[in-house]
Amino acid sequence: FRLSKYREKLIDMITANPTMVQPKERRAMILKQLEDENMDDLCVSRTAFDWGIPMPDGFDKNHVMYVWFDALTNYLSGVNGLDQSDENPLKHFWPADCHIIGKDIIRFHSIYWPAMLMSADLPVPKSSFSHGFVSASDGRKMSKSFGNVIDPHEMLDKYPVDGFRFYLCSEAIYGS
């Protein structure tokens, strides 16, 4: 995938639209990556995995689709976004008003995904907001693989759902 072809256009779009990548610290980080780094083209297949979506017939059978190249398209296919006809009841869901994403995947959502959409001549999401992680008492991010998560179902057995939502929204620091 010719990611390099969209570098300047991405810089121009993000510069012209301050809300395209938020918060401002993440926007600055993405712009710095676009301006300072060599934007290599992106290989859409991988050989290091024995799992994944196979490449179409005619490609090397040892290759599978690069997971991010495939996964990002789910946003569009989930709302039947390629069909912009009046008959598509979901057409008003694309482009997305805002993608809310974790800070560890902002590059994929703020560089790769918009470039993929531009290559297909499709509108890009209006904005992406990158949030931080919920941290455990030791300061590490909460993660199932670390085994330090809180079971939300246990919390809902103790507290009303609206109270729990309010707590999470009011105490979380977006962008941290």
Where are these regions (language model features)?
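Structured secondary-structure scaffolds
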Residues: 1-176
